[in-house]
């Protein structure tokens, strides 16, 4: 492969890299590699999780970065790691404390999945994160992209890491003007261009260049076949879920009537109608089933507790 081992490349590295191009890469892929290494060196972001040698810390950052902006994750990641510095520490923590730390990041299911992953690793892997893609994919909340990121960033192993910034670069450089570009079309190039010697540095360069592209032009990843607009949060079921979780965490315990009243007050303050009790009950039942809080008693006597 035509990659260097260092993350920050000097300005003259393009010619050196170009002279070592692999025959298996197309001319377009060779040009992409040269450009990405050089742009990545110029645009490198010194993020806190890039300066640690801890697979668990890398995993936390990758899960937080799912659908959340980097600037917000920076603040939360450092606080989270200070409170839960190891997989064992997270595994033994109260679920309510983990959820409290997560408030403001959104998509609270990620916090529950992260804690369950920590519990599995503590119980089955001696408090360590597995080092194979297959074992990582079996853990809660870890899909193909997250597993690929962990393999590259935590273990310096070549992997398929196709997330939004990476997708942006490959669509922009290899499919100019094309609409509805599928991941199946991108994956062979992503696989072929991944550095065997420094996958970590390679994907850092892709991420930073992709982030730059999105800030300077219409987002190329919108031309992906898989691009979807994030659903509206205001007034959504997701917002109602988040509000009920916040209420139980703050109160530690609440009755169903209190949950109905709290959500009704919240909706009215937003200029919306109070939700029907059946909707509230459906949401509460889902939250209990998913492990956000526990239920004691049934029917009108039920109480909901932060665990």
What role is predicted for each listed range?
Residues 288-299:
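A short, conserved structural fragment
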Residues 7-8:
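Basic polycationic patches enriched in arginine
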Residues 11-12:
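Intrinsic-disorder-associated, low-complexity terminal segments enriched in Asp/Asn/His/Tyr and depleted
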């Amino acid at each position: 492969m035509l990659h260097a081992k260092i993350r920050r490349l000097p300005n003259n590295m393009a010619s050196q890299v170009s002279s070592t191009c692999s025959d298996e890469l197309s001319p377009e892929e060779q040009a992409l590699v040269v450009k990405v290494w050089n742009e990545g060196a110029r645009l490198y972001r010194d993020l806190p999780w890039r300066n640690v040698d801890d697979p668990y810390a890398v995993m936390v950052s990758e899960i937080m970065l799912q659908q959340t902006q980097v600037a917000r994750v920076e603040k939360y990641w450092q606080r989270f790691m200070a409170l839960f510095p190891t997989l064992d520490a997270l595994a033994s923590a109260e679920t309510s404390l983990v959820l409290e730390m997560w408030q403001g990041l959104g998509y609270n299911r990620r916090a529950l999945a992260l804690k369950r992953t920590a519990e599995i690793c503590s119980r089955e892997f001696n408090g360590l994160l597995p080092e194979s893609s297959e074992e990582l994919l079996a853990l809660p909340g870890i899909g193909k992209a997250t597993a690929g990121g962990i393999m590259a960033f935590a273990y310096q192993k070549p992997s398929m890491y196709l997330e939004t910034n990476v997708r942006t670069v490959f669509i922009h450089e290899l499919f100019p003007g094309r609409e509805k570009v599928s991941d199946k079309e991108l994956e062979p190039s992503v696989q072929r261009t991944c550095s065997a010697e420094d996958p970590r540095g390679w994907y850092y360069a892709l991420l930073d260049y992709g982030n730059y592209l999105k800030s300077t032009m219409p987002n190329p990843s919108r031309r992906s076949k898989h691009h979807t607009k994030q659903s509206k949060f205001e007034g959504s079921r997701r917002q109602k879920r988040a509000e009920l979780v916040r209420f139980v965490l703050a109160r530690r315990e609440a009755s169903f009537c209190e949950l109905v009243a709290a959500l009704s007050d919240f909706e009215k303050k937003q200029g919306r109608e109070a939700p029907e009790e059946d909707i509230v009950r459906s949401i509460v039942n889902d939250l209990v089933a998913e492990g956000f809080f526990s239920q004691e008693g049934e029917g009108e006597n039920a109480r909901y507790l932060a665990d």
